[in-house]
Structures are given as structure tokens and as C-alpha cells.
Design a protein with these regions (language model features):
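N-terminal "arm"/small-domain region of PLP-dependent enzymes with the aminotransferase-like
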Residues: 1-55, 63-64
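Conserved PLP-anchoring active-site segment centered on the Schiff-base-forming lysine
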Residues: 90-107, 126
Length: 180
């Protein structure tokens, strides 16, 4: 559960801290993730391989981000495309349709064009960034709208309120990459 009584600056500094009980260090220590033993068999559940999101630093960072966003949990990824592809694929299945804005990061566009067909996922790109262009692309099997604001690479701004309103009226989700 997130402690909402702490101020933002306190959360930035202290949330998710790793207590150094051995040496009483004040700052959370860094745990390198380069070499760890593999505990097989019964010990695998108790001591999972740290390279798979189990180092104390990864837990520290995810707890801090969750607290700063007033969320229960947060996931961290090694790259933006890992975050984008995981987020999209976790919310679609074969036969679903997603709408993407025309001005979209090239890596995301490439992912869509090379991977969606393998899984039977349909997609379309809007012909503009006006909210009406998003409405025009909605089909019976549309499950979501994916947008960037500002867009990459042209830094165009989309009307998040209007697009999310359209999505809500049709009971479809919106996903927003606001990296910039």
C-alpha cells in the first residue's frame, strides 16, 4: 500500500530505501547484477536469479516509482521499446484492432509492422492527429488507442482529453507514451 501522507520530496528521497543493516550505511547500497550463482531445484523459488528483476536495486527503483506515481506497483524495463512492446502485448489478443497515431516513433512503428501480423493483431494509423481522425479508425474489434504526446520525432501535441473521451465512449483503452 502506498503511503500518501508523505510529501513528494520525501518520497523522492526515502521511498523504497534499502536498509544497510550490516554497516549502517545511510544511502542505499548498489548491488551489481553482473554475476550471480544459479540456485536450481527447490532453492530456485527462494533465491531467484537476480538478472530477472530481483536485485535489491530493481526493487528499490520500482517501489520509488510506484510511490511517486501514487501506484501500488511499478515495472521497470531495460529500454523504452521493452516497455512499449510489453505494455501493448499485455493488452491485446489475436483478432483485436488498435489505432495508432500517424506521427509515431520509428521503433514503435517497426514493432507494429513486423510483429502484429504474427499474432493476428490488426492495426491502423490515423490520417492526422485531430481527434476526429481517431474516431474514423474505430472498428467493431478495436480495443485500444495508442498515442504519444508529444510525438516522436516531430513533437506534435495530441488532444489527450478529446481522444480519451472518444475511447471512453467506445469502452476502449488508451495508452500514452509521454517519454518526452
Amino acid at each position: 500500500m502506498v503511503n500518501k501522507s508523505k510529501k513528494f520530496s520525501t518520497k523522492c528521497v526515502h521511498e523504497g530505501e534499502i536498509k544497510d543493516t550490516m554497516y549502517q550505511g545511510i544511502v542505499s547500497p548498489l548491488f551489481m547484477s553482473t554475476t550471480y550463482p544459479w540456485y536450481g531445484g527447490e532453492d530456485a523459488e527462494k533465491k531467484p536469479y537476480p538478472r530477472y528483476f530481483n536485485t535489491p536495486n530493481q526493487e528499490f527503483l520500482s517501489k520509488k516509482i510506484a510511490a511517486l506515481e501514487n501506484g501500488e506497483k511499478a515495472l521497470i524495463f531495460s529500454s523504452g521499446m521493452a516497455a512499449i512492446s510489453t505494455s501493448i502485448m499485455a493488452n491485446v489478443k489475436s483478432g483485436d484492432h488498435i489505432i495508432f497515431q500517424e506521427d509515431l516513433y520509428g521503433g514503435t512503428r517497426n514493432f507494429i509492422k513486423t510483429e502484429f501480423g504474427k499474432y493476428g493483431i490488426e492495426y491502423s494509423f490515423t490520417k492526422g492527429l485531430d481527434s476526429n481522425h481517431f474516431s474514423d479508425e474505430i472498428k467493431d474489434n478495436t480495443v485500444g488507442i495508442y498515442i504519444e504526446s508529444p510525438s516522436n520525432p516531430l513533437l506534435k501535441i495530441v488532444d489527450l482529453k478529446a481522444i480519451s473521451s472518444i475511447a471512453n465512449q467506445k469502452s476502449i483503452w488508451t495508452m500514452i507514451d509521454n517519454t518526452f
